[in-house]
């Protein structure tokens, strides 16, 4: 089974990203600084050149304007405004959820993939295998595992009915 892979970044390190498998999509997520459009264009061009998908977190309008591959809507984003936007066919809207209520909101937001977290022990929102599996059965959307994935537990996710996984530390450690 081929799993989709998503790498959350908050700074751009082209040398590191270039070393990673081409099937790993990039999600730029930086809530601590103002949006740097020129940096986003640089990342977009890098990703296109290297045949890699690029998603922007939490800004549908800008992702559309920059003609990115899609947008990632975090669990705290409950807005439905983007439903009225003119969205091209191959533009993907993906997003995260921690519970059934958030899954229902993501379905209303018309996302294609739901990132359910946290599958493995993290500081908050820890689900574990049993709760994760139960939540993933509550939707027909494609499921992406998120949270606490590392070299020690990566093989365990193959036991789940998921389309892929997303991580930060797992890909950072491949440096």
Give the positions of each predicted feature.
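Hydrophobic faces of well-ordered beta-strands that scaffold small-molecule active sites
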Residues: 3-9, 24-28, 54-56, 71-73, ...
């Amino acid at each position: 089974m081929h799993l989709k892979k998503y790498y959350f970044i908050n700074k751009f390190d082209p040398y590191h990203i270039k070393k990673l498998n081409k099937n790993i999509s990039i999600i730029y997520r930086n809530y601590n600084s103002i949006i740097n459009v020129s940096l986003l264009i640089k990342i977009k061009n890098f990703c296109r050149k290297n045949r890699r998908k690029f998603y922007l977190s939490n800004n549908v309008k800008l992702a559309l304007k920059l003609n990115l591959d899609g947008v990632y809507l975090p669990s705290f984003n409950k807005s439905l405004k983007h439903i009225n936007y003119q969205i091209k066919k191959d533009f993907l809207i993906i997003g995260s959820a921690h519970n059934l209520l958030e899954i229902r909101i993501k379905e209303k937001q018309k996302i294609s993939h739901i990132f359910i977290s946290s599958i493995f022990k993290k500081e908050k929102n820890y689900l574990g295998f049993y709760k994760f599996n139960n939540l993933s059965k509550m939707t027909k959307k494609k499921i992406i595992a998120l949270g606490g994935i590392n070299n020690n537990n990566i093989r365990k996710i193959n036991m789940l009915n998921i389309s892929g996984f997303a991580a930060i530390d797992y890909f950072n450690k491949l440096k």
